[in-house]
A protein has these predicted regions:
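Accessory RNA 3′-end/elbow-binding domains used by RNA modification enzymes
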Residues: 2-3, 8-32, 38-59, 63, ...
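RNA pseudouridine synthases
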Residues: 9-227, 231, 305
């Protein structure tokens, strides 16, 4: 086979111009087993020559399910996106504890759970519902003194980890086929299901670890929206990929929306604050002081994320030059991108 070049062929690259694909949005991927969350992002970036991308939340390599991926301008949304509750379906194995708290690790403890009745197991599961303290696994991305725990774990070093408060909103056993327990859980962000499996095993008295985990929801993003990575990579056009993306404005579904006219859009794009004289109170949604709002226009879509300096009800009582909104994120649209590329 003849050598062509060291660069990968990109079917979307257009000759004669610098390519900047207008692909901005959030893609809900159904992650397959065996990949890291970063692997998913890298493959999508490479397949479509995307400049910026990232993932919201992390799934362990053995876990599957909902992994929201933000693309290009959507990377600016991450601090403002709602990412809990998290919903999972999992399988826990009673009688063995591992050093990773899942099936990929080495067994460090073995016990017999034959004395356990289904009612005893259900009672122990229920005891974990509510606000609880949890110690992250050694094999995790949590940093201690600037170093990820998993790197120290691979060197055989175990360090003390600080407990974290998390919340289990619901924990239901679906089936018990001893030693396997099939369950569903709804929890806050930052919850380690592996740690939960370990702690349940210790409470039972004979150890346990996680053998299967599938995330079915992350914040507002559900498994019904998720697309397997293989199908994403099989898409043959920019338009096909774009049709799979959740638009920026829709991803911020829970933020109050302000519609801006051309003059306000222009002002915000230059990073300027909006004062009382700029605004018609009758067109504004309710908002409190220091609240985030999204600003959009019919032509441009999402323009910016704003932070309010006062409450909506105060606008009529303040002077005309009183600052009402400050832009904290400004988004490019197709027209502004084309203008930049022509400079």
């Amino acid at each position: 086979m003849p050598f062509i070049s060291g660069r990968c062929y990109n079917p979307f690259k257009r000759k004669g111009r610098k390519t900047r694909m207008n692909l901005d949005g959030l893609l809900v991927v159904d992650k397959s087993e065996g990949m890291t969350s970063l692997d998913v992002v890298r493959e999508i970036k490479a397949r479509f020559s995307i400049k910026k991308a990232g993932h919201i939340g992390t799934l362990d390599p053995f876990a599957t399910g909902v992994l929201p991926v933000v693309i290009n301008e959507a990377t600016k949304l991450v601090p403002f996106l709602k990412d809990d509750p998290k919903h999972y379906e999992g399988v826990l194995k009673i009688g063995e504890e591992t050093d990773t708290d899942d099936l990929t690790g080495k067994m460090i403890r073995k016990g017999s759970g034959e004395h356990l009745s289904p009612d005893m197991i259900r009672t122990i599961f229920k005891s974990f519902i509510g606000r609880i303290r949890q110690v992250p696994p050694m094999y995790s991305a949590v940093k201690v003194n600037g170093k990820p725990l998993y790197r120290m774990a691979r060197m055989g070093i175990e360090v003390e980890r600080k407990e974290r408060e998390i919340e289990i909103f619901d924990l239901q056993i679906e089936k018990i086929a001893f030693p396997m327990v099939y369950f569903k859980i709804s929890c806050s962000k930052g919850t380690y299901i592996r740690s939960l499996a370990r702690d349940i095993g210790r409470e039972i008295g004979c150890g346990a670890h996680l053998v299967s985990l599938r995330r079915t929801q992350s914040g507002p993003f559900t498994i019904e929206q998720a697309i397997p990575l293989s199908k994403v990579k099989a898409l043959q056009s920019e338009e096909a990929l774009r049709s799979c993306l959740i638009p920026l404005k829709e991803a911020l579904f829970d933020l109050p929306e302000m519609i801006g006219d051309d003059s306000l859009v222009r002002k915000v794009r230059y990073g300027k604050e909006m004062v009382a004289r700029d605004l018609d109170p009758d067109t504004l949604p309710p908002f409190e002081e220091k609240q985030w709002l999204k600003m959009s226009s019919p032509e441009d879509g999402l323009v910016a994320i704003l932070q309010s300096a006062i409450r909506r009800g105060e606008i009529g009582a303040v002077g005309p030059d009183r600052v009402v909104f400050r832009p904290i994120r400004v988004f490019q649209n197709e027209k502004t991108v084309r203008k930049e590329e022509s400079i």
